A protein has these predicted regions:
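C-terminal motif of bacterial Sec signal peptides marking the signal peptidase cleavage site
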Residues: 19-21
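Bacterial N-terminal signal peptides that target proteins for export
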Residues: 2-11
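N-terminal catalytic or cofactor-binding beta/alpha core of small enzyme domains
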Residues: 23-467, 471-489
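Hydrophobic alpha-helical targeting segments used for export or membrane insertion
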Residues: 12-17
Length: 490
């Protein structure tokens, strides 16, 4: 479903604010998983199909189940709660992440996840596909006692800003004159969070929902009144979340999402009307940090981005779908890449989205990947001359020096680029039969994860470096190709 006013019934606002009685007409249903635990769920009210409030850790996350119920009561959203699994160390909201082929049948106690069952429960609660999932969690981290952290999927920076501002306004209004902690909200992608949720984002519930928010509250408040206050604040805030994300009354930029059986494709439109250039992250989950980098670089530069998530051995039965070419392969094997129907379909979908994002001819395509076998950035190219490569390298060195300065704790990574220099990772498969051959010019960046992504600070610095490099290099490369650049990077 696309998130626009056309998909929203005219009575939605009334439904949102006056559905506290909806629960009376939406019975709670139960499903047991023998020897492991049980689910409780309730279908979304009419007009709110696709929206689900989840509490995958039940009572193990203090009061998260009751908070999820109250939010579902208030909004009319569907409800999905899991009980009993966490105490047995059974994952609910994500599968077991596996890099190699694994058996399709499991028996207790080997089984470590009930994600497949939870996904079915979400579908029942949503009355179909999950357009918006909101998970409720509690933090056991004492350092996170002063804030609410929100992990997200499918949100733009502008949407995150609007949601943070809405929370601040609701909190300040309801907490005025009351003795309660003033919790800040830290929300992705606007801010980095301390909560590690990569499995949920790349393989779990935030992968399969078109848009998703996982909310983590402090373990406890100083008083029962504080608990009640923030339950009310969050309930009212989620009212706003549903309107902002589904109705988009502010006309904010939104990410277009294509959900597929083994993953998802996200398209971030150019914020500056740029045509002919696209950033790609075809291995956004397998190369774990590249999805986030592509999204942040797109925001900083205004260049359109297409990001693939999922399609890893976890989703594809031990195979990695290559996405930027019509093949798949088992990781760490020396065998050839396999052509398959599913790989061709996923590649076609990715290719078509790249061309749609380019808004015309694909003059320059930029692929972002990561690797861990060397310490240099390697850039494979198509259609780039030695002179152009030399200028890109010179720009990179200058920008790296400006941004890193004398900062000794972040390595100054060298860059090797074709055809100026020989590289080990030549991206030949994508050059011969993949996305790299379709653009007039292509650059395939392999970033050394142990250097550029080792810490949050390194990620931030190299994201800035990469964005600044594209701001300088892209206009030059496009002017060499077309004589002009449509749109502005500066």
């Amino acid at each position: 479903m696309k998130w626009s006013h056309k998909s929203l019934p005219t009575f939605l606002l009334a439904a949102i604010f006056f559905t506290s009685g909806c629960a009376l007409h939406r019975p709670v249903e139960h499903e047991n998983v023998p020897r492991l635990g049980r689910f409780e769920f309730r279908q979304a009210a009419d007009g709110l199909e696709g929206i689900v409030i989840g509490a995958p850790h039940g009572r193990t996350d203090r009061l998260s189940d009751s908070l999820a119920k109250s939010i579902s009561d208030r909004t009319g959203a569907g409800l999905a709660i899991a009980y009993g699994f966490r105490s047995k160390r059974i994952s609910v909201n994500q599968p077991i992440v596996r890099p190699r082929p694994y058996p399709t049948s499991w028996s207790f106690p080997q089984r470590g996840s009930v994600f497949r069952e939870y996904r079915k429960i979400l579908r029942k609660a949503a009355k179909g596909e999950t357009d918006l999932y909101i998970g409720v969690h509690r933090s056991s981290d004492k350092e996170a006692a002063d804030r609410i952290e929100v992990a997200t999927s499918g949100l733009t920076f502008e949407e995150a800003t609007a949601l943070k501002e809405a929370y601040d306004q609701i909190r300040d209004r309801l907490a005025a004159g009351k003795e309660a902690p003033r919790l800040e909200m830290v929300i992705e992608p606007l801010e980095r969070i301390s909560w590690r949720v990569s499995g949920v984002k790349h393989h779990g519930v935030l992968l399969i929902a078109e848009k998703g928010l996982n909310i983590r509250l402090p373990q406890s408040f100083s008083s029962d009144s504080g608990e009640g206050l923030y339950a009310e604040i969050l309930s009212r805030w989620i009212d706003e979340v549903i309107v902002v994300l589904r109705e988009n009354p502010l006309g904010l930029p939104q990410i277009q999402v294509k959900l597929m059986d083994l993953g998802r494709l996200e398209w971030v439109e150019s914020r500056k009307g740029l045509s002919g250039v696209v950033i790609g992250a075809p291995h956004g989950s397998y190369d774990e940090y590249t999805a986030e980098m592509a999204k942040r670089v797109s925001y900083r530069t205004g260049i359109a981005a297409v990001i693939a998530k999922g399609f890893t051995p976890t989703e594809a039965g031990g195979w990695r779908i290559n996405v930027n070419r019509p093949t798949e392969k088992t990781p760490y094997s020396e065998g050839p890449e396999l052509h398959s129907q599913r790989a061709r379909e996923i590649y076609r979908a990715y290719r078509d989205l790249v061309f749609e994002a380019s808004n015309g001819d694909l003059n320059l395509y930029i692929d972002i990947h990561q690797y861990n076998t060397d310490s240099k950035i390697q850039v494979a190219t198509v259609g780039i001359s030695r002179k152009e490569a030399s200028i890109v390298k010179m720009l990179y060195q200058d920008i790296r020096g400006r941004i890193l300065g004398n900062q000794s704790d972040i390595p100054a990574v060298d860059l090797l680029i074709e055809p100026l220099e020989a590289i080990e990772i030549g991206a030949w498969a994508a050059k011969v039969e993949g996305i790299l051959r379709l653009a007039r010019k292509s650059m395939h960046f392999e970033l050394p994860s142990d250097q550029t992504f080792a810490t949050d600070e390194a990620k931030e610095k190299y994201t800035r470096i990469f964005a600044a490099l594209l701001k300088e290099a892209v206009p030059y490369l496009l002017s060499q190709e077309t004589g002009t650049i449509r749109g502005k990077l500066r």
